[in-house]
Amino acid sequence: MTKENATSIHIKDFQGVKIHSFVAPYEYAANATHIIETANELVIVDGQFITPLALAFRGYVDSLNKPINRVFISHGHPDHYFGYASAFADQKGYSLEAVNKIIAEWGPQMITNQKPTFGDMIPDQVLVPQHTVKAGTSEKIDGLNYEFESVEGAENEVQLLIKLPEIGVVIAQDLVYSGVHLWLGMGWFDNWMKELQKISDLEGYNYILPGHGLPCVKDEVVNNIRYLMTAKAIHRKGLSAEDFKKELLAAYPHRESVMMFDLYLGFLFGQMGSH
């Protein structure tokens, strides 16, 4: 992704397993969706927010000329599941049962809330993944092992985390924000930092797929921990939302997607609900 704010496609080859990351422009929060390409099939992770980007992502997926095994939806924030309805409705969807419940319960309201702003750029209805995966289990898909975990009370209520042990990859999604400002709406700084530390401490894993921004290594996980420590300290001062934003921006002037603040300050400062 360049300073010209373009969509980016990043490809990493792990001796035959290719990971493609499709990252939205900064103005759309650098939403990161991913493809795990094995010999015969593709596995998709998340689906972008606005329909044009979701369809562009689907177009890139189809250009690989391999069948899609499934689509994983990491968590119940609309910038990760709207695109499933827009561009992958013909594909099987999988997530944790708790994530599926959140999408079913809150998804229609998210459509209602966002329609006045985005109109036809978002779907008219949500699509809830039809299948579930269980935390603590694993599955081999086209010869590659996927290990499933549930992370609760970090960036969001509950999230699917996937490890690919044979190639040392963690599909962290919104636990990690790479090069952009973090969404802090829930204010669960401490537990989020603990979960990030677990990722940092993992042996044999050093390629991280974030939910926003380009793929990264563990250095960026540590940067996220430091960012959360700074944000927590500023939040404890009891400042107004605007002053909180000014101080955090001053501390991190080089992180992109400043619009992230506008997406979460109402939640963090109690002016909006939990989603």
What are these model-derived regions, one by one?
Residues 9-59, 63, 160-174:
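Conserved beta-strand hairpin/beta-sheet module of binuclear metal-dependent hydrolase folds
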Residues 1-17, 273-275:
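Basic/polar N-terminal segments that are highly enriched at the extreme N-terminus
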Residues 36, 46, 61, 75, ...:
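Divalent metal-coordination and catalytic microenvironments
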Residues 43-46, 69-72, 147-148:
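Short catalytic-loop micro-motif centered on adjacent basic/acidic residues
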Residues 42, 49-51, 145, 152-225, ...:
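Metallo-beta-lactamase
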Residues 2, 201-203, 214-275:
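Accessory terminal helices/loops
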Residues 55, 59-138:
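Active-site HxH/HxHxD metal-binding segment of metal-dependent hydrolases
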Residues 12, 36, 136-142:
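Short acidic-hydrophobic surface loop/beta-edge motif
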